[in-house]
């Protein structure tokens, strides 16, 4: 919060603040925060805390949802008015947002879907085997990683039947290395807004709500 206030003070900002958070948010209350240890955040109204500290209205949104809101309003999905769209933010983890006819279905947390890791013969979080961090830690070639990632996309497709899957996050800038190996029965596109998507989406949602 102190870092946010420092930015606000630096720009002499008086408008609303948007903040992406890696967890489930309901009515601005944090419900989960697994990637941050959880206990110090769960049950906290982070919007109120930030607003009180910075002297501005604040709006909290799941970080993957923020990235998706940016891409559907200002990026590759802006001309898609109908159908189901999924936005993936693939980097240290996997963030997932979904829109039905441009309406956000919040807090999916589909990066934590359970998938079978054939190496250890156990079911683990998809992030553990399909994120870019997993590619690096297991020293996988792009083709090897794409094979894993494609299974994850097929799993998502079987659950949600999307018309379009947008791939963003850190891997998006390396799409020429893996996209040719991706075979899913829907449109696949690379995000336009790159790592700015979460920032843009959080700001957009804050402005929309205030």
Language model features by range: what are they?
Residues 61:
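Generic enzyme active-site microenvironment
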Residues 1-17, 25-32, 48-58, 70-90, ...:
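ATP-binding/phosphotransfer module of carbohydrate and carboxylate kinases, centering on a glycine-rich
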């Amino acid at each position: 919060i102190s870092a946010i206030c420092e930015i606000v003070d630096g720009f002499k900002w008086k408008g609303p603040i948007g903040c992406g958070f890696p967890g489930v948010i309901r009515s601005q209350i944090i419900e989960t925060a697994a990637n941050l240890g959880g206990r110090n955040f769960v049950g906290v109204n982070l919007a109120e805390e930030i607003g009180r500290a910075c002297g501005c209205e604040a709006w909290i949104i799941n970080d993957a949802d923020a990235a998706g809101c940016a891409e559907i309003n200002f990026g590759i999905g802006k001309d898609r008015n109908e159908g189901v769209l999924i936005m993936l933010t693939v980097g240290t983890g996997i963030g997932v947002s979904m829109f039905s006819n441009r309406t956000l279905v919040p807090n999916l947390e589909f990066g934590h879907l359970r998938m079978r890791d054939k190496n250890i013969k156990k079911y683990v979080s998809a992030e553990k085997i399909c994120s870019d961090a997993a590619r690096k830690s297991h020293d996988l070639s792009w083709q090897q990683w794409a094979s894993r990632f494609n299974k994850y996309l097929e799993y998502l497709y079987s659950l949600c039947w999307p018309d379009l899957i947008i791939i963003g996050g850190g891997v998006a800038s390396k799409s020429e290395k893996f996209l040719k190996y991706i075979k899913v029965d829907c449109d696949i596109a690379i995000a336009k807004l790159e790592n700015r998507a979460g920032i843009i989406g959080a700001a957009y949602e804050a402005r929309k709500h205030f």
